[in-house]
Amino acid sequence: MTQLDQLKQFTTVVADTGDFQAMRAYAPHDATTNPSLILKAVQKAEYRPLLEQAVRDARSDSVEDIIDAVLVAFGCEILSIIPGRVSTEVDARLSFDTAATVAKARHLIALYEARGVPRERVLIKIASTWEGIRAADQLRAEGIRCNMTLLFSLIQAVACAEAGVQLISPFVGRIYDWYKKDAGAAWDPIAQGGANDPGVQSVVRIYNYYKRFGYTTEVMGASFRNTSQIIELAGCDLLTISPELLAQLQQSDAPVERKLSPEHAHATNLVRLPADEAAFRWHMNADAMATEKLAEGIRLFAADAVKLEGLIGPLRAAA
């Protein structure tokens, strides 16, 4: 049995790509996208017709509306392949605007529903800022489920759980990158790999906290640099994995053991954290890694949104 098949015994496997042709071979249950992945996909020749059709289908000739149509078009194609849910991301430039995030999420869900997709099959991805978490809280009350992304700390996870969000995406690889860069020449990839990987440890801590205190918010590990990080999180509710790493898992038959479980989580000595706004901002301020990676992630996603707009401009003019 391949490592991928073994992993699926413990964890829901999610494809982390906008390239829906690439995900067919791995039979994922869900799929996630983000501005960077969509940008990468739309530059492939095979997706040009989909892009051009989205331009024609947009409700107006505004770039913003066309981008929304592109995101939903990709999401619908992905949903025709997978049995579960697709995550579609709100523009990162709205990360500090609760009202605008709520409005954009409602609009994206309306576009999906206009194409016959029930809202239960869509997760709206929102950056895990305080403002984004408040937006997710409002959207939950309307039956709109959210996937909180760019999550690098326990306090972000606790605030999301207290808001009752559907799912969080704690990042692994970007945390690993930060600590590796911070350590410089002192970094020891052997000593700080496997279960000692700081990104892995972050997700384990969050998973254990949720299970120990009975939160129903799903934990989906994300942002992997290698298959070792994935294997160390076997048993996590979900893991979203790039096609490249899915291929490596499919090509290996090395044993995979369950590492995370509710039973183990209940035996930990974790204590509850307050998660009001003051506590959230204080804990984030005290965590240089989480603060820097959240800000960087928002900047990178925003930059790719701008690049995507640049690709849309000529198509709009030609339509």
Swiss-Prot record:
Molecular function (Gene Ontology), one example: transaldolase activity
UniProt GO BP: carbohydrate metabolic process; pentose-phosphate shunt
Catalytic activity annotation: D-sedoheptulose 7-phosphate + D-glyceraldehyde 3-phosphate = D-erythrose 4-phosphate + beta-D-fructose 6-phosphate
Gene Ontology cellular-component terms listed: cytoplasm
Keywords from the named record: Cytoplasm, Pentose shunt, Schiff base, Transferase
Assigned EC number: 2.2.1.2
Cited InterPro entries: Aldolase_TIM, TAL/FSA, Transaldolase_1, Transaldolase_AS
Catalytic class of the enzyme: transferase
Protein name: Transaldolase
Species, as recorded: Ralstonia nicotianae (strain ATCC BAA-1114 / GMI1000) (Ralstonia solanacearum)
